[in-house]
């Protein structure tokens, strides 16, 4: 009994250890079983038919890829058999009692897992082999979607702008043909018939592009047609305005001529209307070359008639108001021209422009008198001559305006040249005057060469100023040539004078500093006396050089005596 009690804990420990070992093996077997079931489910859910079908449909002939498809089908049969066998084995291994057959279960479940892994690897290899077929299938549909989008835009454009106005049967036939081509291409994609698919795609591309070009050109001509129609309405309205305004614009005694003009315009408008009707027919027949030529002719005809009608309905009262404004400003214009002529009486180009202006003024005055004579004639008015005089007067006024603008611009430019001449001349004279005052005020001893340059430049400037009163143009040209030389001379004189002033100023500053040490040494005092004499003789370069040498010696002696230089 005592021995049993002693061995009891040991027995319990052994039993507990065996229980833990059994639980560990059971847990490991459950994990292997779960992993194998997951792999089985993934393989079971994968459909190998979707891999074989595109590859099988891609062939153009039934026997072309027969051997390859045979291999794929053999693998599919093997794949299905393996999956079914795995299901049967998993059913056996999933029984509760079998999981406790540790060695047998572990060996068989690992073998099944290995077989399924090998099956999965083989399946991925075949999927990679047939991947290009699937990619081709998807890209074909992407291309088809692109053309469908273009077709939708074209269909919408035709329905909105063209199909109701023009040959709807033509566009309906084209749209139906394109729809049938889409169906054919879809069938080729499904059947993987590459050659037919490419042929249908090329045909679709050509028809679609030609239809887009045709619709676009037809729409543009439709816009031009609307534009021309609008111009015709404006022309017809202007004809009606002519009839309403005949009592004001055209004398009643010339009514027969007015009606003749209106009838001629009306006939031409009717011809243009008939031409527009033919243009609609040409647009419907899509003869773009003839349409372009017809529209070009029509536009020229409309422009020509518009000018004619504008001439007929010209507002004579407004024209008279313009003439009155001109007559009011004519005296001021003449005064201005005389003032410019007086200022520039020796200028040939100004004189020629003034002659041209006077000729235009005389022509305008003559035309105004003729216009007044035509307007006062109550019995008979020659409107052809009246319109001709109005046109001539307008041209003369425009020419007068341009000539006057040219004259004013020329005068302004010459005034600018004159101001430049006077300002530059006075500026040179004033600067030389300032330099002379500076020399006098500072009592500078300037070199004879510098004084000679100053006197020569002043004399030359005075001569130019005097000569300008007699021959301004020649003097201006001469002065323009000498500006650079005068500027160089002025710069040299300024440099000479300023350098003297600066030297004297530096000498003064050096004397102020050196005088502080005059009592330190008799040598310093004697040196300063000599330098002062040089300074009084205005020998500033030698004075400054001597002062610099003296200050250098003072600085050296101060350092040797250990004195602090102030």
Curated annotation (Swiss-Prot):
Gene Ontology cellular-component terms listed: membrane; septin ring
BP GO annotations: septin ring assembly
Official protein name in the record: Uncharacterized protein MG397
Record InterPro entries: EzrA
UniProtKB keywords: Membrane, Transmembrane, Transmembrane helix
Annotated disulfide bonds: none
Matches recorded under Pfam families: EzrA
Membrane topology category: Single-pass membrane protein
Principal place of residence: membrane
Keyword Transmembrane helix attached: yes
Subcellular compartments: Membrane
Transmembrane segments: 2-22
């Amino acid at each position: 009994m005592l021995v049993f009690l002693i061995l009891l804990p040991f027995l319990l420990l052994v039993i507990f250890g065996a229980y833990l070992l059994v639980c560990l093996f059971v847990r490991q077997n459950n994990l292997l079983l779960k992993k194998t079931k997951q792999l089985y489910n993934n393989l079971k859910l994968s459909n190998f038919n979707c891999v074989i079908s595109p590859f099988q449909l891609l062939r153009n002939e039934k026997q072309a890829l027969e051997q390859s498809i045979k291999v794929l089908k053999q693998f599919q049969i093997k794949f299905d058999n393996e999956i079914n066998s795995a299901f049967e084995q998993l059913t056996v291994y999933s029984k509760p009692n079998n999981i406790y057959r540790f060695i047998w279960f572990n060996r068989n479940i690992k073998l099944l897992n290995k077989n399924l892994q090998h099956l999965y690897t083989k399946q991925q290899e075949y999927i990679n082999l047939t991947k290009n077929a699937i990619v081709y299938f998807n890209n074909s549909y992407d291309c088809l979607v692109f053309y469908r989008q273009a077709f939708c835009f074209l269909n919408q454009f035709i329905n909105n702008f063209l199909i109701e106005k023009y040959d709807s049967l033509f566009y309906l036939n084209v749209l139906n043909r394109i729809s049938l081509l889409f169906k054919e291409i879809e069938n080729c994609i499904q059947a993987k018939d590459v050659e037919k698919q490419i042929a249908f795609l090329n045909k679709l591309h050509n028809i679609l592009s030609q239809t887009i070009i045709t619709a676009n050109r037809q729409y543009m001509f439709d816009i031009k047609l609307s534009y021309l129609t609008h111009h015709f309405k404006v022309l017809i309205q202007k004809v009606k305005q002519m009839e309403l305004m005949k009592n004001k614009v055209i004398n009643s005694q010339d009514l027969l001529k007015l009606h003749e003009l209106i009838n001629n315009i009306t006939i031409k408008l009717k011809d243009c209307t008939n031409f527009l009707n033919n243009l609609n027919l040409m647009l419907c027949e899509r003869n773009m070359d003839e349409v372009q030529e017809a529209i070009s002719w029509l536009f020229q005809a409309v422009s020509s008639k518009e000018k004619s009608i504008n001439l007929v309905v010209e507002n004579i009262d407004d024209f008279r108001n313009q003439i009155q404004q001109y007559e009011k400003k004519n005296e001021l214009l003449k005064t201005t021209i005389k003032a410019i002529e007086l200022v520039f009486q020796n200028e040939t180009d100004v004189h020629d422009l003034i002659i041209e202006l006077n000729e235009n003024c005389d022509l305008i005055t003559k035309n105004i008198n003729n216009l007044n004579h035509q307007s006062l004639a109550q019995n008979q008015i020659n409107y052809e001559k009246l319109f001709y005089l109005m046109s001539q007067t307008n041209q003369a006024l425009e020419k007068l305006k341009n000539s006057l603008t040219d004259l004013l611009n020329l005068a302004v430019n010459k005034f600018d040249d004159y101001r430049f001449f006077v300002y530059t001349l006075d500026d040179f004279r004033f600067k030389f005057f300032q330099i002379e005052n500076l020399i006098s005020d500072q009592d500078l001893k300037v070199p004879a060469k510098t004084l000679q340059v100053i006197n020569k430049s002043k004399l030359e400037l005075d001569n130019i100023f005097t000569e300008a009163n007699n021959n301004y143009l020649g003097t201006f040209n001469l002065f323009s040539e000498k500006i650079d030389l005068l500027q160089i001379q002025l710069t040299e004189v300024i440099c000479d004078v300023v350098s003297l002033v600066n030297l004297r100023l530096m000498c003064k500053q050096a004397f102020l500093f050196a005088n502080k040490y005059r009592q330190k040494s008799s040598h310093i005092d004697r040196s300063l006396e000599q330098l002062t004499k040089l300074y009084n003789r205005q020998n500033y370069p030698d004075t400054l050089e001597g002062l610099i040498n003296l200050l250098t010696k003072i600085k050296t002696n101060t350092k040797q005596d250990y004195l602090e230089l102030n």
